[in-house]
């Protein structure tokens, strides 16, 4: 069993077309369960790598739900509390603390309840469209790892919108990260997320993403292949269902630039 996607409480599912190299999100409240039993014992056998990836997936769910254009008074508390729990519990859970593993199981469920109602953003759009895009090269960009790599870049992109910047600042305040201005708070938030990736052995960019998902000097996605497929991936990401609730609507040019930042780990 896994702990991170919160499919037990959401209206979302995913179909992967490996021939086309695309993941398709499906959203319908008819697939939301009437009752969910969240049993933390089921998460205790998760491998360490899975703990890392699903944990950052849950963090992305909560942050994207909080800054989504569909956020509301009922989803904000769920998202913020999930963020705080993940901040304190994910790294210890990754290092084998089973009490924190239990707590993470609850946190990911809270994040799921938040995003199932508030929806997501382009971190997920990009993860959906890059995940299987290079499967012909013998590997898959694991969804949670993709979210972890892209989240700091998307925050920097979205924070150019003043409303989104304010929401990210509120997250940083809730996490007690410090900072005197909104710009400082956004920078501290992205820096904190990058440190979490370091602690979880997750790469910062596609270029350094190894076939085993661990950081490496040269990842499994060749630069020339990435650049060749970039326009199509960007177009597909813009059309993804999660893009509509993102606080900034990217153009084709902006999405390509953002994906390049995620490949090379350059500033947005």
Predicted regions: what is each one?
Residues 64-121, 131-136:
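Glycine-rich phosphate/diphosphate-binding loops and the adjacent beta-loop-alpha structural elements
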Residues 4, 109-147, 240-245:
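Glycine-rich phosphate/pyrophosphate-binding beta-alpha loops
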Residues 1-73, 166-170:
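A glycine/threonine-rich phosphate-anchoring loop and its flanking beta-alpha core
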Residues 133-136, 140, 144-225:
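Gly/Pro-rich interdomain helix-loop hinge
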